C-alpha cells in the first residue's frame, strides 16, 4: 500500500488548491493523493482545477478526485485510511479541517498563514510551509514558485518517513 496524502476543502482561491496541484507535480510519484474537493465558488476556478487535475493525472497518476463534499462518517473513514493531510490555504482564519485531520491521527502539512500556526506546531504535529503574501487582501504568495516548491518539499519529507509521520500524527491527536 502506497503512502496516501489527503486534501479536503472547497474549491476556492483561499483554499490554495491550484498551488497544491502544481506542487503535486514535484512530489514522489510513489505518493498516492486523494483530493476531496467540491463546491467551486466560481466557474473560472472550477475549470482551472479541472484542467490542472487532468494534466496532473496524465503526468503522474496515483491521484483520485472525489468531486463532492462527503458526509462526516465517510470523511472520517477516508481520513483514517490516509497517512498525512495537506492544507495549502492562502487564507485561513483557523483551519478547523486541520483539527479534524489531527483528531484522526494525521500529521498536517499546512501553509503558515492566518490561524494555522495556532493549530499546527511545525516539526511536532506536522510541517508549516512558509508563505510571504501580498498585502492586497487576496493572500496571494509574493513568490508562488517558492511556495509551491516548499510545499512539495514538506510533503515529500513527511511522506518519506512513516515513523515520523505516525509520531507527528499521534502528537496532534494528543
Predicted regions and their residues:
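A short, well-ordered alpha-helix in the C-terminal region of glycosyltransferases
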Residues: 150-153, 157, 164-174
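Short alpha-helical donor nucleotide-sugar binding micro-motif in glycosyltransferases
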Residues: 76-82
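Short hydrophobic beta-strand element within catalytic cores of glycosyltransferases
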Residues: 107-110, 120, 127-128
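A conserved mid-protein helix/loop that constitutes part of the nucleotide-sugar donor-binding site
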Residues: 3, 12-26
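Aromatic "clamp/platform" in nucleotide-sugar-dependent glycosyltransferases that forms part
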Residues: 90
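Short glycine/serine-rich donor-binding loops of glycosyltransferases
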Residues: 95-98, 116
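Nucleotide-activated donor-binding/catalytic signature segment of Leloir-type glycosyltransferases, i.e.
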Residues: 35-37, 46-69, 73
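A structural motif in glycosyltransferase catalytic domains
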Residues: 5, 20-21, 33, 151
